[in-house]
UniProtKB/Swiss-Prot annotation:
Alphabetical list of Gene3D superfamilies matching this protein: Aldolase class I
Residues annotated to bind substrate: 9-11, 171, 204, 225-226
NCBIfam families the record matches: tim
Compartments, record wording: Cytoplasm
GO biological process per UniProt: gluconeogenesis; glyceraldehyde-3-phosphate biosynthetic process; glycerol catabolic process; glycolytic process
Descriptive protein name: Triosephosphate isomerase
GO CC, alphabetical: cytosol
Biological or metabolic pathway of the protein: Carbohydrate biosynthesis; gluconeogenesis; Carbohydrate degradation; glycolysis; D-glyceraldehyde 3-phosphate from glycerone phosphate: step 1/1
Length: 243
């Protein structure tokens, strides 16, 4: 039985004070959320301690927005798994389209980050997806399969999450049709060869489309960006009812 993971990625938003206010408004709205799902938030590193305190005794788990594959060293601007574990982090987002784009992250680096996560007891959320140009050229499946094969090499498929995030749908207001997202997620499952693999969809997820997305047979959760920044909006997503 695949347990859906509903994750909100705050990216570079929210101070500690804003995170406290958010949780004060958010937690009461998910008190009666069905227990058949995981609800996760990925704040900036600076807010992890604040979020750990606010989420204590709640159903909300914590994710980091990245992790380095070394335990320590001269890696300016990076963070280690051990540092994250100190704050109660359970998930790590790796391979998101923004680090791939802005910092030229390779599939090999993403694989190192994911392997380290699993070795330390963290669950990597490995992001894959095609650009608008790749989609227009009919290369989407080839690109995603390469990302899967290289990014997931050597990983335990039962201890990770894959997030399919078509880059052209991130922060653009464009949404991949639920049926098409489900088709790609089904392909990913077949390529990995793991029936129980949890696969999320990410890309302009919002309260108005969450129920339809979660009704799809191969979508096991969502990775939410902008719509996770407002507690009312993300609470509605976390409380989805598949139609």
């Amino acid at each position: 039985m695949r347990r859906p993971v509903i994750a909100g990625n705050w990216k570079m938003h929210m101070t500690c004070a804003q995170a406290r206010d958010y949780m004060a408004a958010f937690l009461p709205q998910i008190e009666r959320a069905p227990q058949d799902r995981e609800i996760v938030l990925a704040p900036p590193f600076t807010a992890l301690s604040t979020m750990a305190a606010a989420a204590e005794h709640s159903v909300v788990g914590l994710a980091s927005q990245n992790v380095h594959w070394q335990d320590h060293g001269a890696f300016t601007a990076e963070i280690s798994a051990e540092m994250l574990l100190e704050h109660g982090v359970a998930y790590t987002i790796v391979g998101h389209s923004e680090p791939r784009k802005y910092f030229s992250e390779s599939d090999e680096q993403i694989n190192h980050r994911a392997r380290c996560s699993q070795a330390k007891g963290l669950i990597p959320i490995v992001c894959v997806g095609e650009s608008d140009e790749q989609r227009e050229r009919g290369e989407a499946e080839r690109v995603i399969r390469r990302q899967i094969e290289q990014g997931l090499e050597g990983l335990d498929a039962n201890k990770l999450v894959v997030a399919y995030e078509p880059i052209w749908a991130i922060g653009t207001g464009k949404t991949c049709e639920a049926a098409e997202a489900n088709r790609i997620c089904g392909l990913i499952r077949s390529w990995v060869g793991a029936t129980d693999l949890i696969i999320q969809y990410g890309g302009s997820v919002k309260p108005t489309n969450i129920d339809e997305l979660m009704a799809m047979s191969d979508i096991d959760g969502v990775l939410v960006g902008g719509a996770s920044l407002k507690p009312d909006s993300f609470a509605r997503i976390a409380n989805y009812q598949a139609i």
